[in-house]
Every structure is written in C-alpha cells, then in structure tokens.
Amino acid sequence: MKLIRISQALRSLKKLSDEIRYADCFGEKQFTSGLIAFRPTKKSNPKQINHADKDVVCHVIKGSGRLRIDGKRFPLRPGTICHIPKGTPHDFAAGKSEDLILFFSLIKTH
C-alpha cells in the first residue's frame, strides 16, 4: 500500500518539455498512475499520443483546458473525469491563464 499527497506529488513534477511536467505516483504490472501538468502556451504541441495497450483514466485536479480526440475538443475543468480507450490518439492543452493538472491512470488491457 502507498499513500501520496497531491501537494507532495506536485512538488516533485519533472520537466518533460516546455509545456509538460509529470510525476509518477504508483506503478504496478497492470497500471501506472501519476500527475501530469500542462502549462499554457501560445500554441500547444499538435502531436497526439496513443497508448496501444492501455486505457487512460484522467481526473482534472486543477485548472482548465481541453482534451482533443478525432478533431473534437472537450472542455476540461476541476472535477471532470475522462476515459480514453486504448489505441485512441489524443492530446491535452491548458487554458490561457493557468496550468491544467490531471491525475491519470494508465491501465493495461488485453
């Protein structure tokens, strides 16, 4: 068993790019969970990510932004939870004024 405070995980975010920071919180054979933070940018990276063998579940912790799937944009705000099936290309972007912070789980599916 492991307990993590979100405030503690936020302090341990590591830079992935100018736009993205992340922190792994939990990891097992079938799943990984953590925090990911997107900074506001004038133009977000249009590259989409695809997890071929993992479903994604995200919970918006702080900030606002959007999720893009198949050219459709879905607004994200604190309290929003989303499920992205494996193999679905997607990307996230923060709104204009503050970071978009998500708690995510990548769940290996067969």
Question: What are the functions of these language-model segments?
Answer:
Residues 27-29, 68-72:
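Short strand-coil-strand connectors
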Residues 28, 52-53, 60, 85, ...:
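A short, compositionally biased micro-patch
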Residues 49-51, 83, 90:
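Histidine-centered active-site/metal-ligand motif
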Residues 38, 50-67:
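Short, conserved beta-strand element in jelly-roll/cupin
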Residues 71-86:
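Short acidic-glycine-tyrosine-enriched beta hairpin
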Residues 14-48:
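A short glycine-rich, His/Asp/Glu-containing loop-to-beta-strand
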Residues 86-110:
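Ligand-binding loop in jelly-roll beta-barrel domains
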Residues 57, 64-66, 73, 89, ...:
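Structural motif
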